[in-house]
Amino acid sequence: MGSVSYTAMTPLSFLERSARVWPGKVAVIYGRRRLTYSEFAAEVEQAARALRASGVQPGDRVAYLMPNLPELLIAHFAVPLAGGVLVAINTRLTAHEVAQILRHSGARIVVADASLLPTAMTAAGGLDAVTRLVVVADTEASSARAEQAVGPAAEPRLVSYREFLAGQAGDPLPWSVPDELDPIAINYTSGTTGLPKGVIYTHRGAYLNSLAQIIHSRHDENSVYLWTLPMFHCNGWCAPWAVTAIGGTHVCLREVRGEAIWQQLREHGVTHLNAAPTVVSAILTASQAGPLTRPVTVTTAGAPPSPTTIAEMERTGFKVVHVYGLTETYGPFTVCQPQPQWAGLPADQRAALQARQGVGMIQTGGLRVVDSAMADVPADGETMGEIAMRGNTVMAGYYLDPEATAAAFRGGWFHSGDLGVMHPDGYIELRDRAKDIVISGGENISTIEVEQALMSHPCVFEAAVIGVPDDKWGERPKAFVVLRPGTSTTVKDLAAHVRTRIAGYKTPRDIDITVKLPKTSTGKIQKYVLREKERSSHAHQVQG
């Protein structure tokens, strides 16, 4: 293919263009700190030169362990500009878990926030592959954190971010790549079923998914995007690249709390944010919550939002975009595309339609619900099968794991492990993870369906349902519920309410009203933690 009619796709071109088109426009806001697009590009080039000067060669992995700071946003461009591959690590992991990722990825350089330096140092302690530890002092955080960053250290590989960048000047770097299928990032899965797997993203996939985020989340040059979604989670659904591509403004946020989010919403005129439903719930129940003076588009994924949550968001002034995907699909892969006729429906009916996972996004290549023989299930909204995907934004594979890659890609499709149905209108609806489905007396019970029935109760803030052993039925559903602040109800009342929504055999016999539910850093409820507790409790009862 001739070079005149072909250019390798890379998100690097987004910042190169925006720095030319909007050089004086504010690109990044963090506390008192501001970066124009021209300054943003200059800091990216400086960091890329520092990485190269530290020995980063094409394809080398560079790990970042930090919250949503400007430095992590810069890294999404600087690391690939230097020819490296970005490995953004979950900040909630233990040193042992971080070490597993550093060891598997073979990261040469680790860049860490000062507050996470002890974790980074412990994790890198026995790894000779790590040649440099760079610590970032967050000047907008507490002075203690900043002082911690610049104090003396026995670790010879340690250097401050300021020292790391010092004196890095030279000729302009090329904002291009030789091959669009080269890796741009490796994102590690949660590892709830074993060791985390490294999911490879390419320049091409990141480029196309970024354009899809612009289209489906309705971004333009007036977008003010609040960073409530961790950048370490699927590279923030490619929003570092998407918002930059369209010339929007990034508002960085160190800690995701309801009050802090409302402050940013009002202070900076935020127009967009991405969040899991649990984060959305925290926003809605924050003490500063109130009607918005301008619409804010919330793109949400994770656990399917309940119709009750969607209706409440709309009343507050949030415009909901519901998407679905996995780490292996660069984050969002489907969108619940609104239809004009939905607007005239009652709120509860419209919300129920919007809670579905929808149709393939514009960049995708295929979306199916299949049975064990890879045949499409009937589009009847009832027959469950596994959701399978293929196309431009499915991962290149699992890093250094050809067997897991082959298993995930069997039959020429990516197997999600999620169970769902296909509706007659072509929209899919997630019913459960394959491991979360409850099989009671031979009947499949969708825990999501039970959770949504519970969430429709006015006192219920959050709900999680798992399967627990039952001598008669094999399994039965058990619910864990967090009530809304200032409300009260009884288990009997909750069960009676659920029976008005779903069949009696699906209604949990056991409902625990609790203070909080275990969650991941992105706000997803960790059902495996609940299952482990129940398993331990059941084993103790049997032994006792």
Locate the predicted segments by residue.
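Conserved AMP-binding/adenylate-forming
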Residues: G248, R266, P305-V323, T327-I428, ...
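Conserved pre-ATP/AMP-binding loop-to-beta segment of ANL
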Residues: P23, V135, A154-V159, A166-Y188, ...
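Conserved AMP-binding/adenylate-forming core of the ANL superfamily
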Residues: T7, L12, E16, G24-L69, ...
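Conserved AMP-binding A3 loop
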Residues: T36-E39, I184-L208
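Conserved AMP-binding/adenylation subdomain of ANL enzymes
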Residues: Y207-V224, F232-H272, A286-S287
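AMP-binding/adenylate-forming catalytic core of the ANL superfamily
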Residues: L93-H96, V110-A112, L273, G391, ...
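Adenylate-forming
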Residues: P67, A112-M121, L229, V256-A260, ...
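Structural core segment of the AMP-binding/adenylate-forming
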Residues: A53-S54, L81-E163, P485-T487, L494, ...
